[in-house]
């Protein structure tokens, strides 16, 4: 396309749909930190969500190989979960003992930014279509927090003498887990897609990328992204 065979600097703008998989590890009852048992439920240990976000890139096309730097920000994920369970412990002589367990959790996760550098090779099938593959290394910034509280209440319900039942609170316990991290790491990914030359300088781009954001302390974060954008070569 063009007398320079497609060479030159370019800019690209994409709209991406991202599937995000977030896995957290927290202290377990049998772990080395069993004195710090976490109250965090499985719901906040294995999060699957999605987001739509813009991405911008600047690069240089060498007429087959391309290199590009890109920047993206992701949507902040947050959720809360409350559960309650009442278990009967004893029931005799018109006295009933129950254990009430309440769990309140609030969690957030935000891939604040991703600054990447990619190398891409274009396969020229004809004058219009160019499938491509590539690799990407990126510096990512992630913030996440969790507040989890587990409260147990043991109470006695007495119906002695046929009178209205009387409830007595016998024992209360409360355990809380709070964690907040801001982490920066380098991760690796792969890129694939196809470009369609609308004009010698303007290309429609449909792409896919997988990125592993690296080991973020006790968190693993992976994204699968499908994107549609336009690339303009100067």
Curated annotation (Swiss-Prot):
Gene3D superfamilies linked to this entry: 2.40.160.20
Presence of the UniProt keyword Membrane in the record: yes
GO molecular-function term, one example from the UniProt record: porin activity
Alphabetically ordered keywords of this record: Cell outer membrane, Membrane, Signal, Transmembrane, Transmembrane beta strand
Keyword Signal attached: yes
Residues making up the signal peptide according to the UniProt record: 1
GO cellular component: cell outer membrane
Pfam families cross-referenced by the UniProt entry: Opacity (PF02462)
InterPro entries per UniProt: OM_autotransptr_brl_dom, OMP/PagP_b-brl, Porin_opacity
Location within or outside the cell: Cell outer membrane
Record's function text: Implicated in a number of adherence functions. OPA proteins are implicated in pathogenesis and are subject to phase variation.
NCBIfam families listed in its UniProt record: autotrans_barl
UniProt family annotation: Belongs to the opacity porin family.
Protein name: Opacity protein V28
Protein species of origin: Neisseria gonorrhoeae
């Amino acid at each position: 396309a063009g007398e320079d065979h497609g060479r030159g600097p370019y800019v690209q703008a994409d709209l991406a749909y991202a599937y995000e998989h977030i896995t957290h590890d927290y202290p377990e009852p049998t772990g080395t930190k069993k004195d710090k048992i976490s109250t965090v439920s499985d719901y906040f240990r294995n999060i699957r969500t999605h987001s739509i976000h813009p991405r911008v890139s600047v690069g240089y096309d060498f007429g087959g190989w391309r290199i590009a730097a890109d920047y993206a920000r992701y949507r902040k994920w947050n959720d809360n979960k409350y559960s309650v369970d009442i278990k009967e412990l004893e029931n005799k002589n018109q006295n009933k003992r129950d254990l009430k367990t309440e769990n309140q959790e609030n969690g957030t996760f935000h891939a604040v930014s991703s600054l990447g550098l990619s190398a891409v090779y274009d396969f020229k099938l004809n004058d219009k279509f160019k499938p491509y593959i590539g690799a990407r290394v990126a510096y990512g910034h992630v913030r996440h927090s969790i507040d989890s509280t587990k409260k147990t209440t043991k109470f006695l319900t007495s119906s002695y003498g046929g009178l209205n039942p009387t409830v007595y609170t016998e024992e209360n316990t409360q355990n809380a887990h709070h964690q907040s991290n801001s982490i920066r790491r380098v991760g690796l990914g792969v890129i694939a897609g196809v470009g369609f030359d609308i004009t010698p300088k303007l290309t429609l781009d449909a792409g896919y990328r997988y990125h592993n954001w690296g080991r973020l302390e006790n968190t693993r974060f992976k994204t699968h992204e499908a994107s549609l954008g336009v690339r303009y070569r100067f």
